[in-house]
């Protein structure tokens, strides 16, 4: 089996999985970081919130994101460069939270992140019957 799939399989078999959930939406206020313990599987899954913090975005990062945020015309090179930068910054923010909480990174099984939302295209806006609501997120890493 692929070693990465094997690792995911092994995590799924654990009685308790520690998962970091990230949320960074259109308000651009910062990154919400939630550490949860998951027990069980399927409809019997139980979730316990262990820690939560919001790490604010500084003014420079907000300005950089706003250059590509919710615009129909953007500099795609800037978008491409911002894509890994957001991932790296989110990683640094995660590490700061873990340090603040006194939790070693080795105790985290997974990080669930959709990235930083930069564009919403709801069906009411694009008007295409064959497509639903859609969004674009960045934050590779």
Short names for language-model regions:
Residues 1-141:
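Short acidic/glycine-rich loops and adjacent helix/strand connectors
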